[in-house]
């Protein structure tokens, strides 16, 4: 059960103990965290578009969002949550995040909405468990779900987290500091084949085998402890012509390790069906992805969700077997120049959204209807 200190104003419930922390609680200018999008220079990506897409679901009962529930499955420091709670003064919001430091900041930021907010410390693929734990059904209980994927600006800016290759810090990369495996654990202990597989699958690194071989040779006499040590090795392992194109030579390796440490792609694959199940009829799901591996998963799950459930080969649509969802976006939406100028992080975003149209739980492995 959550402790008393985790219930400021009797509202903020935490799924697991979340100690208050001063880690990385300053803005770039060194000041204390304050409410608003100035926190850590944090501006929520595509905030207005997310509001526009989710508003019809959140205002079905009342224009102010009363009786509606929104799950922000990647709460972070609360930028999107603050926007929705301000826009819809009757809305109830459930915020999930695995990062206790982010939750601590969001908790302060959203305190003025405390009577309408529940914050839960958990991975987002525990969505169904979290809903049940706090009194909500895992099926058809919420009006909207929002995912803003990837590493946050706060995590990148917090040097000690080890996400950035621009600083010499411990090789960590854990979104939840209590997670058992760090990037250093992977680099120092996984065998060469496993390392190469991680770099190839999660970083799409074409020099994966070469880098893995260099890592294994180096760690045999000196284990890796810092990001700078790994960056130096990558400069040695990647051929000079390749280093001069395609961005920083460490970019793909760091992405791959971060995804592996935090099990990001498996978590995403597992949570999307649960998020679809959680939506009420007319409920909406919005996902912001920042790299192609995430977006492919979202695209595939959405395509399955909007497909007919009539068995392949039948010449007609069986009654009651139509799709339970419809797409709200044509392909992935991208930020325009104005959005990118306001928020450079939005340059990489791919936004997809859909809406539930019928009752029913989605199968784990949906079967697509074939051509008649």
Curated annotation (Swiss-Prot):
It is found in: Cytoplasm. Specifically methylates the N4 position of cytidine in position 1402 (C1402) of 16S rRNA. It comes from the Bacteria. It catalyses: cytidine(1402) in 16S rRNA + S-adenosyl-L-methionine = N(4)-methylcytidine(1402) in 16S rRNA + S-adenosyl-L-homocysteine + H(+). It is an enzyme of class 2 (transferase). It comes from Mycobacterium leprae (strain TN). Its EC number is 2.1.1.199. Keywords: Cytoplasm, Methyltransferase, rRNA processing, S-adenosyl-L-methionine, Transferase. S-adenosyl-L-methionine binds at residues 78-80, 97, 124, 148, 155. Belongs to the methyltransferase superfamily. RsmH family. This is Ribosomal RNA small subunit methyltransferase H. The keyword Methyltransferase applies. GO terms for molecular function: rRNA (cytosine-N4-)-methyltransferase activity. GO terms for biological process: rRNA base methylation. InterPro entries: RsmH, SAM-dep_MeTrfase_MraW_recog, SAM-dependent_MTases_sf.
């Amino acid at each position: 059960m959550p402790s008393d200190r985790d219930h400021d104003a009797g509202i903020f419930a935490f799924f697991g103990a979340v100690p208050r922390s001063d880690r990385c609680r300053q803005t770039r200018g060194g000041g204390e965290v304050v409410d608003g999008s100035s926190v850590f220079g944090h501006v929520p990506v595509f905030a207005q578009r997310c509001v526009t897409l989710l508003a019809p679901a959140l205002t079905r009962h009342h224009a102010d969002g009363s009786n509606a529930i929104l799950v922000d499955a990647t709460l972070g420091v609360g930028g999107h949550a603050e926007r929705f709670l301000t826009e819809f003064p009757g809305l109830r919001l459930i915020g999930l995040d695995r990062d206790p430091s982010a939750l601590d900041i969001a908790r302060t930021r959203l305190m003025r909405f405390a009577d309408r907010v529940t914050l839960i410390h958990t991975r987002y693929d525990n969505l169904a468990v979290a809903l049940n734990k706090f009194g909500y059904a895992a099926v058809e209980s919420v009006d909207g779900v929002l995912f803003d994927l990837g590493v946050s600006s706060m995590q990148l800016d917090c040097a000690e987290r080890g996400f950035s290759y621009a600083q010499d810090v411990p090789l960590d990369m854990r979104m939840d500091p209590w997670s058992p495996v760090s990037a250093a654990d992977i680099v120092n202990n996984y065998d060469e084949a496993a390392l190469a597989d991680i770099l190839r699958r999660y970083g799409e690194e074409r020099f994966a085998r070469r880098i893995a071989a260099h890592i294994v040779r180096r760690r045999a006499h000196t284990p890796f402890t810092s990001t700078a040590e790994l960056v130096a090795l990558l400069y040695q392992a990647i051929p000079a012509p390749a280093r001069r194109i395609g961005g920083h030579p460490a970019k793909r390796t760091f992405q791959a390790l971060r995804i592996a440490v935090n099990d990001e792609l498996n978590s995403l694959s597992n949570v999307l069906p649960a998020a679809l199940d959680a939506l009420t009829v007319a409920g909406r799901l919005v996902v912001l992805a920042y790299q192609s591996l995430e977006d492919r998963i979202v695209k595939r799950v959405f395509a399955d969700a909007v497909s007919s459930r009539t068995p392949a080969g039948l010449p007609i649509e069986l009654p009651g077997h139509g799709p339970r969802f419809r797409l709200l976006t044509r392909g992935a939406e991208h930020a325009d120049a104005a959005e990118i100028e306001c928020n450079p992080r939005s340059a990489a975003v791919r936004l997809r959204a859909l809406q539930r149209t019928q009752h029913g739980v989605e199968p784990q492995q949906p079967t697509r209807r074939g051509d008649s």
